[in-house]
Amino acid sequence: MDGIHHGGHGRARPSHPMAFPDFDADSHMMSDDFSLDTPFSPSGSSNANDTVLGNSIFPEWTNGVSRGDSPDEMQRKDPLGAQIWKLYTRTKSQLPNQERMENLTWRMMAMNLKRKEREQQARASETLSPTPSGIAQMRLSDQPSPAGGDLAHDTTSDPMNLDDFIVPFDSPAEHSSHPIDRHFTATPTGSIPIKSRKDHAMMDSSTAASFPHPPQDQRTNSEFGYVARRVRKTSVDDRQFFAGLSVPTRKRPAEASPQVPPVSNAMMAQHSELSSALPDYSLDHPPSAYALSGNGTVGPRRPQHHHTHSNIPYGLDTYGISENHGLNSAGSYQQNFHFSPSDSPMTAGNPFSSLYAQTPLASSLNSTEFFSPPPSGYQSTVSTPQPIYEGEQSIFFSDAPSAESHTQRRIPNYIQQRQSNLSASLQPRYMYNMSNGESHSGSAVTGPPTTHVSGFSVPPPQHINPSQVLGHGEFSTTAPSSSMFTFGGDSDNEDDDGNFGEGGGMTMPNDFASLDESGDMSAGLHWDGGFPGSIHSLPGFNAQHRKHVTIGSTDMIDGPPEWNQGGTLGRAHGSAASVSEVRNQNQDPRRYGKVPRTASTPNAAALLRQSLNGSASGPPTNHPSPSTPPESGLSSAVPSRPGSPGGSKNGDPNAGPTTCTNCFTQTTPLWRRNPEGQPLCNACGLFLKLHGVVRPLSLKTDVIKKRNRSSASTLAVGTSRSSKKSSRKNSIQHAPSTSISSRMNTSESPPSMNGSSSLGKTGVVPIAAAPPKSGPPAGVAQARAGVQVAPRRQRRLEKAPTGSDPDAKDSPKSAAPPSRSKVLPLAPAMAPPAAANPANHNIAGGQGASQEWEWLTMSL
């Protein structure tokens, strides 16, 4: 017991309420260095606690003797504690250096206590003496300290229990007793639920918005310590007591977003552990259109730290390209990719998502050949091989292989493809440009191209399952790998068909297995090289035809079944069947677009689709004369722009309506094309042509203003406005067919072109306004100059004579090729569109060179 008294007297301090009252109540918490004892003084020994803390190292050694009986007293109060104490001291007394050990123990505990005391005092002076204003005061006043000053003192010291992490001498009891206050400034725990909440928040895995700043002790100990260091400007609780701390006053932070973690990618990269506490959320998730990245869902699919691998700034890897290593060729565009309405996450099922795939444009564009800002609209559905970025693969194809199909997709030849297709006019107007450069050489499809671009098995309208055509490997390895996208216009079905993803997607060694190395597709569409489909058939065409936008000769044939294949508009991968061919093939163009199309804007896609449906497999039946190249409808020299992808207005139910790629309208008197061949409404097309920039959607209106062209009315010799209108009414229904047939007739063959030119000289406007490179241009110009547009009725009459056109029906379309000039009046008659739209580049207006210019630029 000497040991007890000796060290024990110091220790006898157990009576010293601080340690041993604790011992009484909490003595069950024991630690070798008595640290157990000291901390639990909740019993009421706050006074003793104060004395102990107030004394320098151990006053107990000085006056501890007076309390030397404490073991007895302790036994009275807490027999168990006394037993432990005796056992401990007795053991110490038997140690060789008992005095020194005991002294050392006490000193260590004293140092801990002293430090604790100093910290307590400092904090108390800072937090309590300044009489914290506002919330702090209200809390203190609201909370009558239940345990009295002792508890208050204890709790104030509790924040010191930060030292639990530094000085592990606290007893478990204390931890349990004041677990929360430990992290906050002095106030009784129980009465401050907010503290518990904050403590929970501090300890909680969900980090506050200030998370990037590692919590510091001072800040942790203060009520709003977790807040970023800012001046706290609230009237209450101005945190004056922070002055003593090195923590500057700070403003309370906004609620941390549970979804957007505050950590930067750099932090994540360096401290991967930080991400564990953060919700797995990132802006990476591709909008549903792209959601294909890994699981085909738009949910949080990748840990945010995957951003860092993406070369897209801000971690906005909307394309999921970080996983899509094959798409690096499109990388440059990723940074200026645009959130177009079709991409919008809000329109998950956007029907255009497939029609206008969001393939990055800029990377592969030849800026010189790209006539509008790359992000201006959807990429040409035909001209660009587009990986699907959609998670809802079912949209495009029923047999979506797996969400992996997107990630595996690679676009090796993407740039070359884009080059060939983007230079709209340079390329043969063939929408399918062979990746092996055939398109550049103008060696368009020779022989009956079997452009069964996966879904686009033209001859049989039914969809050819690419898996049948391509096999299930990387598109049947037998297919020559030389041509990646043999044609820009491979249908979405091909790109997106299940087997497409299976093989790793974009690396279609040869999208069309049937394509032989030469790119000669030899089995699908029954187009002769002589057909308008083959560019060579175009009279004015040479492999490098003029660099202005070709307006008319090619049309995209959307395999009708393919169009809506996934239930959404598939890309219209038109094989650029010339519009004339389409016209030749269309059985009853009237049944197709009700919107009258001007001669310059043949609804070729619809017509071709129609013809494909009806007579795709067979030779075109509607050629005015089989001998004349079907293409004649558009003098190939006339840069007729490809038909609207959406083609038929009211026609083929399978064909989605033509939609403006800029404003997404489906109603326009005249369909135009952007440099890439994508359909633009008249307004957007004109705007682009005139201003060189994409028409802002803010200008979009639902009202189509019709302009009375006095010039057109005057030009129409002997035709009164009313007569025009009446004829217009009559012809409007058939307008598409009319323009088509007339065009077919007029440009049906180079001879017809010649005829048209001569006619033009006679003052009749050839319908194909674009002057062929040969005489027709001059003829056209002359014709325009002397545009004597016969009234529609006259036109019709003239048409009637021309029996060559099978569709002659009363519609003007049956104008004979020579009557091309007469047909031209028809174009104005196409009235609603033509007259309404100056943009109607129909020579209907007959406005001289300006119209020629319009013709040249019409595809815009």
Swiss-Prot record:
Positions with biased composition (Low complexity): 747-758, 766-791, 813-840
GO molecular function terms attached to this record: DNA-binding transcription factor activity, RNA polymerase II-specific; RNA polymerase II cis-regulatory region sequence-specific DNA binding; zinc ion binding
Ranges of Basic residues composition bias in the record: 1-14
Keyword entries, A-Z: Activator, DNA-binding, Metal-binding, Nitrate assimilation, Nucleus, Transcription, Transcription regulation, Zinc, Zinc-finger
GO-annotated cellular components: nucleus
SMART domains documented for this protein: ZnF_GATA (SM00401)
Subcellular location: Nucleus
Principal place of residence: nucleus
Domain of life: Eukaryota
Keyword DNA-binding: yes
Basic and acidic residues compositional bias, start-end: 174-184
InterPro entries hit by this protein: AreA_GATA (IPR013860), AreA_N (IPR011420), Transcription_factor_GATA (IPR039355), Znf_GATA (IPR000679), Znf_NHR/GATA (IPR013088)
Disordered: annotated segments: 1-24, 116-159, 174-193, 559-600, 612-658, 706-850
Biased composition (Polar residues): 122-144, 577-587, 710-719, 732-746
Mapped zinc finger ranges (GATA-type): 660-684
GO biological process, one term: positive regulation of transcription by RNA polymerase II
Functional summary from the UniProt entry: Major nitrogen regulatory protein.
Name of the protein this chain belongs to: Nitrogen regulatory protein areA
Species annotation: Penicillium roqueforti
Gene name in the database record: AREA
